[in-house]
């Protein structure tokens, strides 16, 4: 049986094809039939239009295939024509292959005679079959039996032939009206959505099923619902699409009256009876319980709507399907709808296609608009509604006009988009709206626990309110626990905030308005937040009492989107901050310390990035609510305050605090500290010892050259970055760090040896150190070690025995490396010994003997003897026996021809393509030699080895072609020699030829 989607995607030349016996109906019934269809605007194929001289049978066959509906007029002489019977076979074939609709009319003949080929109809059939084969007879007989079972109009059941023709024409019109249309052809991603929803619908199951389509506003739920209605309607007795349910709340109706009105609307639509009136709520069940119906309830926003229209499955006949589209997932739980298709955002590629369809009327951007297209797609957040509306507005616009729209989109949402998205916001209660606004303005992409701490109030169940926003698809919680709101919804929130009356406005975000409020001390208790971008303002002087009247101010964020180096805010040293502050974010804070009267007991986050602070405050503050402390870039900061009470602090950022020399001993109390950033603390030399922070997992201390002692803050630590420090040794106590996964000591030149490592370690980076020795015992037992990086360890002479778990060994530019311990236990690893020019022959043999290694590279110019199939140049042909598969090992000699760039050679790719003797593709392999930062790349001749497998080899010759390309297009390498070793099913004959392409 053809799928409905196949018929939906076809172009039909004719609405109707009629199969008939001419002498029975052409000048009587058929002529009236044609006239009625013409009056109804239904195009029929007319066999009288066939040009003379054209073979009639192929022309009719083509006409059948190009018709949406075929009507078979079965008269007493229909079976006397082999031509008619062949038409019937073609019609039924089109029904199966293309989803063509078949209707029947029994004109002066009994359906039973058609099915059984009896009576006068049977006599005519037997006469036709007399000169035909038994196979033809069987095919015709089966076709007549099938078509005789199709319920159709029977002339004997009608007193008036004209009325019967009107009824047939009306039925055809209805079928054409529900015929899958072309409205959704070419809609990006629609086919994938329809395919997935159809699997949920399980259309072959006779149970009644309710399925939901859920997702945020503007994602395309209604569009998908309409496409489904178009696609599947012809599979049901009655169908209807009930739209605008969100607005179905007539004034003056109680709940019972509302439900009656909704049921009347549904029955009027599905039964095609305008003005249906009912007097009780059992009407839908009474009228539809034995009908197979397909109903789509669009934009449902109240469970009462579902109770009125689809309260129970037994309201509908077997095989019925009810689809509900909604943004509210909680509503679906309340009604017990468990089968839900959640409409996700399109991929980057699909989003660009959607935009281009409307902006350029094609699926890709025009020349010169690629970057602009990506910018618009990003600003629309890949929301289909936004892409459609903005794309349509950009149609025919030049690049300058596109750039104007992009600048506008950063702060203002299109009215048509806002009209749709604002509905969700307006459906919220006051507390929920307040939460929505605060997330939109302050806390999008923030950690959920942090947001709860920021917004928690005694009278507000923040967890419950967040769940409401999630269930209404206004936010979602990412897998890492962050609260995320769509960019366009953020703009909806900002504009909703700005529409409030100034004296009622809860959050101030307009820079000029904020300046006016602060300069004139006219803030009010209604203000809970200030988001102040100082980039575009003139100089503003703030009095010490500017914030005092804002007694409920909890969130203060002062920042610059454009950093020009100028401080435009003049603030007094004794400025009063409201005591209820939970968020204080002030980029480039201009004073040496916070005011003496500053109270921090309610602070959840203190962010003073790039400040001029030398210290925060004297003495000890109550900091039990503080979770984040960010002082990054505070060059002048000399000391931290007493943090004894900051027992809930989770993140501490001291990066680029150039003057900070030591950490306070009170840091030992930070038992919830998860991550600490101290990169580029160039003066830091003293850290507390003998402390064990229970929660610390990650420590960043890159670029702390004065730090000589290995920090031992926590035995629970997972990641430790000590890049370019003055650390001289790794202490034995590190073996107690049983959760440590990664240590990066690269660039720590004082490190000479390493003797102790924890067994949990997965990644170790000792690159650019002066390490001379790695103890055998500390590496070989690391059964989880995955990556070992030793680049530019210029004093390292030998490698210890390595664990079998190792997948990547990078020892590039180890100029003194001579020995590699045998066996090299890396059966499936990648071994990079680029520019290890002193690597001995014995070490090279150890590397070569790793037969299953993913790939390996080291300096050399002589092909190993075990590669018995070899050739000069980059191609090689081998004669083989046919086999199910071949495993092979390849070796290529890489010669640098031209190196323009001495540093940052990040990648060299080697491609191997295998064809048979006739040039047909057999298999391929791509090897990428990743070089670390600041690598000089391959400077001399190198041998590169890699493995491959060829499956289903059914030829007697294989041709290997190798190509090499560099990340930097200015560099030029060549493959001067290549070789292959067959590891299984060794061919009897040697290679025949080779050469360069």
Swiss-Prot record:
Keywords of this entry: ATP-binding, Hydrolase, Leucine-rich repeat, NAD, Nucleotide-binding, Plant defense, Repeat
Record-listed E.C. numbers: 3.2.2.6
Active-site residues, record numbering mapped to chain: 87
Top-rank taxon, per record: Eukaryota
GO MF, any single term: NAD+ nucleosidase activity, cyclic ADP-ribose generating
SUPFAM superfamilies according to UniProt: L domain-like (SSF52058), P-loop containing nucleoside triphosphate hydrolases (SSF52540), Toll/Interleukin receptor TIR domain (SSF52200), Winged helix' DNA-binding domain (SSF46785)
Domain TIR: start-end pairs: 12-176
Reactions that this protein is recorded to catalyse: NAD(+) + H2O = ADP-D-ribose + nicotinamide + H(+)
Disruption phenotype: No visible phenotype under normal growth conditions, but mutant plants are susceptible to the pathogen Leptosphaeria maculans.
InterPro entries, A to Z: Apaf_helical (IPR042197), Disease_R_plants (IPR044974), LRR_dom_sf (IPR032675), NB-ARC (IPR002182), P-loop_NTPase (IPR027417), TIR_dom (IPR000157), Toll_tir_struct_dom_sf (IPR035897), WH_DNA-bd_sf (IPR036390)
Alphabetized Pfam families for the sequence: NB-ARC (PF00931), TIR (PF01582), WHD_ROQ1 (PF23282)
A Gene Ontology biological process term: defense response to fungus
LRR repeat start-end pairs: 194-218, 534-557, 600-623, 624-647, 649-670, 671-693, 694-714, 715-737, 758-781, 783-808
Enzyme class of the recorded protein, top EC level: hydrolase
Domain notes for this protein: The TIR domain mediates NAD(+) hydrolase (NADase) activity. Self-association of TIR domains is required for NADase activity.
PANTHER family cross-referenced by the UniProt entry: DISEASE RESISTANCE PROTEIN (TIR-NBS-LRR CLASS) FAMILY-RELATED, LEUCINE-RICH REPEAT-CONTAINING PROTEIN
Function: TIR-NB-LRR receptor-like protein that confers resistance to the pathogen Leptosphaeria maculans (blackleg disease).
Name by which UniProt lists this protein: Disease resistance protein RML1A
Organism: Arabidopsis thaliana (Mouse-ear cress)
Lineage: Eukaryota, Viridiplantae, Streptophyta, Embryophyta, Tracheophyta
Designated gene of the protein: RLM1A
